[in-house]
A protein has these predicted regions:
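Pre-Walker A (pre-P-loop) alpha-helix and adjacent loop at the N terminus of AAA/AAA+ ATPase modules
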Residues: 1-30
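Walker A/P-loop
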Residues: 29-61, 141
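AAA+/P-loop NTPase substrate/partner-engagement loops
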Residues: 52-84
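Conserved alpha-helical scaffold flanking the Walker A/P-loop in AAA+ ATPase domains
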Residues: 71-111
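Conserved catalytic/switch belt of AAA+ P-loop NTPases
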Residues: 97-138
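A short helix-turn-beta junction within AAA+ P-loop NTPase domains corresponding to the substrate/partner-engaging
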Residues: 132-150
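C-terminal alpha-helical "lid" subdomain
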Residues: 162-169, 176-240
Length: 240
């Protein structure tokens, strides 16, 4: 789903990676920060960006690992860096890394890593806290991506795309019902995320699949599907 302002940011990240010629086999520069609210799809974005960077670096089978800051605190950093040599490490909830982990990772990044790409993903405040107390570590992250807050139209577009990818289609009244569900969740102190829309869509899909025998027969006869043989999600599937 095209997201407002993301294309420009991605172009910048790829361009910066191309221009970064002073890694000298290490991870001392050219690493990436991904900032966004909980449930905004940071990890999916991180994996896509890593793949794009690896393609640009002409790495055919670059290794990629995803780990949380908490889990990394219990691991041997040297071993992880050595296993992922030349690949990428995506650290979710990076703000949960403790001081010792940050220091060890910082040192490991200055050694021969095969130019391993490190991606930290986190919400703004915990990431700012982590980096402000570790300035040397912060300098190694020269690119950043900010996942924007989605407006309702973008969230509905995501819902439609998600439905299509899973063999479903939302009819016009169903789209209005989806807008209504999203609107009910939006509050001054809470912004609706992609993860929440995915939940709404999963519920609607589950509801349409739990139809009785009569409706299954109807669908077999061609009703309740569109020309591309996708099952139609309608208003009643969202009003549950």
């Amino acid at each position: 789903v095209p997201v407002r302002g993301m294309s420009e940011q991605l172009v910048d990240v790829l361009e910066q990676d191309k221009q970064c010629t002073n890694r000298q086999g290490t991870s001392k520069t050219g690493n990436l920060l991904i900032i966004g609210r909980k449930g905004s799809g940071k990890t999916v974005l991180a994996v896509d960006v890593v793949k794009a960077i690896q393609k640009q670096r002409k790495l055919k089978q670059g290794k990629v690992a995803i780990i949380t800051g908490d889990s990394l605190n219990k691991k041997k950093i040297k071993e992880i860096v050595s296993k992922l040599y030349g690949g990428a490490l995506i650290i979710e909830k990076a703000g949960r890394m403790n001081e010792k982990t940050v220091q060890r990772l910082n040192k490991a990044m200055e050694r021969d890593t095969g130019e391993l790409l490190i991606v930290l993903e986190e919400q703004r405040k915990p990431l700012d806290r982590l980096l402000s107390s570790n300035k040397e570590f912060r300098r190694k992250f020269t690119s950043r991506l900010e996942v924007p807050i989605f407006i309702n139209d973008e969230l509905v577009t995501f819902g439609q795309t998600y439905a299509k990818e899973n063999g479903f289609k939302i009819d016009e009244v169903g789209i209005l019902a989806l807008y209504s569900r999203i609107d009910m969740l939006q509050r001054e102190d809470h912004v609706v995320t992609v993860a929440e829309v995915k939940e709404i869509m999963d519920e609607a899909i589950e509801h349409v699949q739990k139809t009785n025998v009569k409706k299954i027969v109807k669908r077999v006869l061609g009703k309740g599907r569109d020309d591309a043989d996708r099952v139609i999600l309608s208003e009643k599937d969202f009003n549950i």
